[in-house]
């Protein structure tokens, strides 16, 4: 019995050992499966992290593209507004020019008709008794006036022809404006990546972009704007604004280019939100620092400059400009407090095109003033001409009255010269050629008629008796 108990005990121990071994085997197998699952989860986690990194990269690229799209949409909206405004002005200017041309043509026709009527009245009134010398004198009076009218007509045609050509050129430039701005924006983005970190290169490139905007605006260097002008202030130190734009009425606008690309470049290359936000704050701080430094220069107080109350701070990179203002709109107010206006290539180009239009209208106004002055002088000349022609007409009237009086004494009335001359012929005076018989007969008849109307008197003079006898014989 003891042996059986021992056998059972051994069997029990063997069973326990086998159970323990089996349990250990299952535990080891479960642990191996857990390790495999953990490795699989680590691999999946690594793949997920890689996908998140790629997703962040693509999100940054997408945001960059969205900013570029918004920038281009803003440029397009601004250009469309500028195009509509310029088109409206062109139509108004064309209508105004057409009205002026019609007025000039009507005035010229009226003047020609008045001159023609005046000349016809003068020639008719003189009854074709004006000799060749008087006609030459009249032509000498009319020739300078005709030359002035021709010169006035040529000046008006040249002025409006030049204005039409300028309008055509402006239309052509506006059509290319969108392509130019889009190209400039793309080049600005590309160069932002190429110029990061080199402040000197960035500054030079900013001046190049500013120069291109000035050239595209239609303004002329040396006439409507000047670059790198060195001016000595009251403290004997020299200041050198990047650009000084001249305005009509003797005013100036100062433009200073500022580049801020380092923080802006790090903003787009940041791999996480914290780095991106930090770079954005540095970019805004850089713009704010440029505003303060530019405000301290106080360009408005430089001697010889009749500048406006503000300076234009030019940021050449359009997306950098929009990013700073989008996140910190208060920058505009801060700039205005320092007498500074923030401008980008698009807004500066619109402002410069407006200044170019102001200069063109100023030139047209000066031409109109010259035309008005010449018209005033022409009016004065015409008034003097009419006064002279009136004096000539009065002289002709007086000459005609004198002619009638002389002819009356010659052939009309009692005792006229022709009647007395015919009486001499009746007395036997020898003549070589008789006076016009009709005129002589009329003169004798007039003399006889006046004699019959008057109270008869006894002639005491023998000559008068012979004259009466001659008249009776003539009848």
From Swiss-Prot:
It comes from the Bacteria. One of its GO terms (biological process) is DNA recombination. The keyword Cytoplasm does not apply. InterPro entries: DNA_recombination_RmuC. The keyword Coiled coil applies. Residues 25-200 form a coiled coil. Residues 440-475 are annotated as: Disordered. Keywords: Coiled coil, DNA recombination. Belongs to the RmuC family. NCBIfam families: PRK10361.1. Involved in DNA recombination. This is DNA recombination protein RmuC. It comes from Escherichia coli (strain K12).
């Amino acid at each position: 019995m003891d042996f059986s108990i021992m056998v059972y005990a051994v069997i029990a121990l063997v069973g326990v050992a086998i159970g323990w071994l089996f349990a250990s085997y299952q535990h080891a197998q479960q642990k191996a499966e857990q390790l495999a699952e953990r490795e699989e989860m680590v691999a999946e986690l690594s793949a997920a992290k890689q996908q998140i990194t790629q997703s962040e990269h693509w999100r940054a690229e997408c945001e960059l593209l969205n900013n570029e799209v918004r920038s281009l949409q803003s440029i397009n909206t601004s250009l469309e507004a500028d195009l509509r405004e310029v088109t409206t002005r062109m139509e108004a200017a064309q209508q105004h020019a057409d009205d002026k041309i019609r007025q000039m043509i009507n005035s010229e026709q009226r003047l020609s008709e008045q001159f023609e009527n005046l000349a016809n009245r003068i020639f008719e009134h003189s009854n074709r008794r004006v000799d060749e010398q008087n006609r030459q004198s009249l032509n000498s009076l009319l020739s300078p006036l005709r030359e002035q009218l021709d010169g006035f007509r040529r000046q008006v045609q040249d002025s409006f022809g030049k204005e039409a050509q300028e309008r055509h050129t402006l239309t052509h430039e506006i059509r290319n404006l969108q392509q130019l701005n889009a190209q400039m924006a793309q080049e600005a983005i590309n160069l932002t990546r190429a110029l990061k970190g080199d402040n000197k290169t960035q500054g030079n490139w900013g001046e190049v972009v500013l120069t291109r905007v000035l050239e595209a605006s239609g303004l002329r260097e040396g006439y409507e704007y000047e670059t790198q002008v060195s001016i000595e202030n009251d403290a004997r130190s020299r200041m050198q604004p990047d650009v000084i734009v001249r305005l009509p009425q003797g005013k100036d606008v100062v433009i200073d280019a500022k580049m801020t690309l380092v923080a802006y470049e790090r903003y787009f290359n940041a791999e996480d939100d914290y780095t991106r936000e930090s770079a954005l704050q540095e970019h805004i701080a850089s713009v704010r620092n440029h505003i303060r430094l530019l405000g301290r220069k106080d360009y408005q107080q430089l001697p010889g400059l009749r500048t406006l109350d503000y300076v234009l701070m030019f940021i050449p990179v359009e997306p950098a400009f929009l990013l700073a203002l989008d996140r910190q709109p208060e920058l505009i107010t801060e700039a205005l407090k320092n007498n500074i206006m923030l401008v980008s290539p698009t807004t500066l180009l619109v402002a410069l095109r407006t200044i170019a239009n102001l200069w063109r209208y100023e030139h047209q106004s000066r031409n109109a003033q010259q035309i008005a002055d010449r018209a005033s002088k022409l009016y004065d000349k015409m008034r003097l001409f009419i006064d002279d022609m009136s004096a000539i007409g009065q002289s002709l009237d007086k000459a005609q009255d004198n002619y009638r009086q002389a002819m009356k004494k010659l052939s009309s009335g009692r005792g006229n010269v022709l009647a007395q001359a015919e009486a001499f012929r009746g007395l036997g005076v020898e003549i070589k050629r008789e006076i016009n018989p009709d005129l002589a007969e009329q003169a004798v008849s007039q003399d006889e008629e006046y004699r019959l109307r008057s109270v008869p008197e006894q002639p005491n003079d023998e000559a008068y008796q012979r004259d009466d006898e001659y008249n009776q014989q003539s009848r």
